[in-house]
Amino acid sequence: AAKTVCVVDLPTLTGPPGNPKIPRFFKELPAVTLEQLYALIGPDMKAVDAVIRDRLYSDVVLVRQVAEYIINSGGKRMRPALVLLAAGALGYQGTRHHEMAAVVEFIHTATLLHDDVVDESDLRRGRDTANAMFGNAASVLVGDFLYSRAFQMMVAVDNMRIMQVLSDATNVIAEGEVLQLMNCHDADVDEARYMQVIHYKTAKLFEAAAQLGAILGQATPEVE
């Protein structure tokens, strides 16, 4: 039997008969590959990359060097893609999703910079980490720059719900980092605590990315 995934089924967004307030928007269809999903948003991903390059700019040379090094070090851009896919599924027609996708990538990249310093990592994705190349201090400070640049871009959108989602997400991510630090040498850590750490550290930003697309698409709270 073919594998299945849950995908948005746009014709059923109005909800089931008799209860239109509850959205009925998931349907089982044959599984799709990442390549097929990215093909749906190819032009949008190029637009996001252009926003990232533009908004990375700083008059401080070292900021540019470190930020460009980590941004260009590979990765699938899955979190930005999720913003674009969610917004597109809900019929969003503007360009704000490009900005928000870049914001999510900046936040993610900032966490990587900080992660590698905390973990004393020398390699990421087969390349020297930014802290191995430029030192811990530069990595931490450029991570801070990316966080603050992300919030500058957020404010420009002038949407309090978006600001709430992203500020909550960054706070939870920081808590996840501390939780991991507390438990990294604990051989008795249980499954519940492990799941809490990965929810805070990793899943929360994926959740926020999907929410941003829904907010831009003016989805109902139930869909969001």
Task: Show the residue positions of the predicted features.
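Compositionally biased, low-complexity intrinsically disordered regions
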Residues: 2-3, 17
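Leucine-biased recognition of intrinsically disordered, low-complexity hydrophobic segments
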Residues: 10-13
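Short, Lys/Arg-enriched N-terminal segments with co-localized hydrophobic residues
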Residues: 16-31
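Mg2+-dependent prenyl diphosphate-binding active-site environment of isoprenoid biosynthetic enzymes
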Residues: 36-47, 53-224
